[in-house]
Amino acid sequence: MDKFRVQGPTTLQGEVTISGAKNAALPILFAALLAEEPVEIQNVPKLKDIDTTMKLLSQLGTKVERNGSVWIDASQVNIFCAPYELVKTMRASIWALGPLVARFGQGQVSLPGGCAIGARPVDLHITGLEQLGAEIKLEEGYVKASVNGRLKGAHIVMDKVSVGATVTIMSAATLAEGTTVIENAAREPEIVDTANFLVTLGAKISGQGTDRITIEGVERLGGGVYRVLPDRIETGTFLVAAAISGGKIVCRNAQPDTLDAVLAKLRDAGADIETGEDWISLDMHGQRPKAVNVRTAPHPAFPTDMQAQFTLLNLVAEGTGFITETIFENRFMHVPELIRMGAHAEIESNTVICHGVEKLSGAQVMATDLRASASLVLAGCIAEGTTLVDRIYHIDRGYERIEDKLRALGANIERVKGE
């Protein structure tokens, strides 16, 4: 397994170009199954999950090409089953189900690997499709959906806010007969982006970005060209990298209005921030950040995907800061690793109490999930000595060429090939 070897401490400064958002590109690629004509999708990041999705679409009979943009022609789709081999590595595969049943009247997707039935994350997807008139069976580890004729529009009240299920219901409803209203819908920018992509193909969707989305079904969707929005979490990660190292950065190809909560907290931490239409600059003027209190919640509040990075910021800040995680359980697995590097923190139920220290020391640490592992790499950039970050395949799932981008900012980082 590959590792990162990072030598610190360094002050990170310079410019970075932000990639397209994985969390928008994935649902958009699956939604392209609804189109009867070719689609060109621009600004798609080069990541493992994207490659897996393109492979999956090919297996269904879709023509998929990548040269700069990703080109998808789903006019000849003739297989309606997403097999376990491809699904097991990627939960997002469930997003194939809605488009398949909406356009072809049938679809089956292998259940994402090792889901305990009780806490199954696909439940909200299934109940949503059932409310649109699909018949759902769980057989031999597959979710099988079918409908005679077209799906029917419905008034759907989501039990809880779910980005994934909002995407599934919205995508399927574009080809349903009649009008669908989704109440308590997710409001994330990636939902808005997916909706705007579908509108480009001829869908009738309004209210995206609010908790009530209305979809008027149409008979068919055509082709089109669409550009995926910039990755707000990658943007936030690089802003934090500069903030914790007393540095100065400009993020290009960014979208500031998707990061309001994060920018507000960085300003509280003492960062000097300016924004333009497609750029964000941050300057710490060589100062240490001040500790901030953060509470994660669904968009437009503070994103859970920035929690690990702000935990790190607080651990090297002046003062004491509280980080409360309300979205996911077990999302503090980076904290014991940071403590190995000299951080002072206590975990009390869903809150981390961070006591800022002046410096961290390099250590051997292990990545546990995507965002936690990014925070360990950033910690290595500012720690004294050498940090080895193991299991970095987590990082590769969500960050495009993170070591190249950090190196361009002055980091001393290299990828060490595993056995």
UniProtKB/Swiss-Prot annotation:
InterPro entries in the record: Enolpyruvate_Tfrase_dom, Enolpyruvate_Tfrase_sf, MurA_subfamily, RNA3'P_cycl/enolpyr_Trfase_a/b, UDP_GlcNAc_COvinyl_MurA
Entry annotation: catalytic residues: 115 (proton donor)
Signal peptide positions on this chain: none
Record-listed 2-(S-cysteinyl)pyruvic acid O-phosphothioketal modification sites: 115
Top-level division of the source organism's lineage: Bacteria
One GO term (biological process): cell division
Function field: Cell wall formation. Adds enolpyruvyl to UDP-N-acetylglucosamine.
Family as reported in the entry's similarity comment: Belongs to the EPSP synthase family. MurA subfamily.
Name used for this protein in its record: UDP-N-acetylglucosamine 1-carboxyvinyltransferase
Species annotation: Citrobacter koseri (strain ATCC BAA-895 / CDC 4225-83 / SGSC4696)
Lineage: Bacteria, Pseudomonadati, Pseudomonadota, Gammaproteobacteria, Enterobacterales
Gene this chain is encoded by: murA
